Amino acid sequence: MEFKIRLATEGDAQAVHDIYGSYVPLDYVTFTVENPSVDHYRKKIAETLEKYPFLVAEGADKKILGYACGSPLRPHDAYQWNVEWTIMLAEDAPRRQGIATALYKEFAQLLALQGYRYIYGVLVDTNQASVALHKKLGFKEAGHFENAGFKMGKWRGILWYVKEIGSSNEPPKKPLSLSEAM
């Protein structure tokens, strides 16, 4: 399977919308109940790229096969060296072809260059494919919040996974913006 990893552009908003939207009706992938608009994703891509990577996997036919993006772990200043990531593959993207792994490797490499220390993944606890991916990538389970969300008539828990990608030298420097690191 031929594909490349690149930074997302606002022109990828429709594809990101469609990929994420395919998971919204499922109770075991995301707690989102209604998929936001394409314009929401256009803004999200632009705003994310100011600080964090927003990557897409693009097939040889230019179709977007998946994406990975970062967001703040928590709003408080002391958390600024941590990033929560989201990774999604298109419903029809081939599995076990290295797409998710390639997205992760590029994502983690960029975050490390920026000076981030930890990547966190927050998964619905019944999403075994995502659990397996995080374990394969070297993440460690950091917590389990039972019955954290209610969707489609069921309570679901979330699992927190974490991976250290930066050094633990003190005192840490403020992370660079994505453009400063590239």
How would you label these PLM feature ranges?
Residues 4-16:
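A short beta-loop-alpha structural element at the N-terminal edge
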Residues 17, 21-44:
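Conserved GNAT-fold acetyl-CoA-binding loop/helix
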Residues 36-94, 104-105, 164-165:
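Acetyl-CoA-dependent GNAT
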Residues 63-66, 129, 155:
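Glycine-rich acetyl-CoA-binding "A-motif" of GNAT/NAT acetyltransferases
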Residues 69-72, 120-123, 140-157, 166-167:
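Conserved catalytic-core motifs of GNAT/GCN5-like acyltransferases
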Residues 96-109, 132-136:
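Conserved acetyl-CoA-binding loop-helix of GNAT-fold acetyltransferases
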Residues 111-123:
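Conserved GNAT acetyl-CoA-binding A-motif
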Residues 121-131:
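Conserved beta-strand-loop-alpha-helix junction that forms the acyl-donor binding cleft
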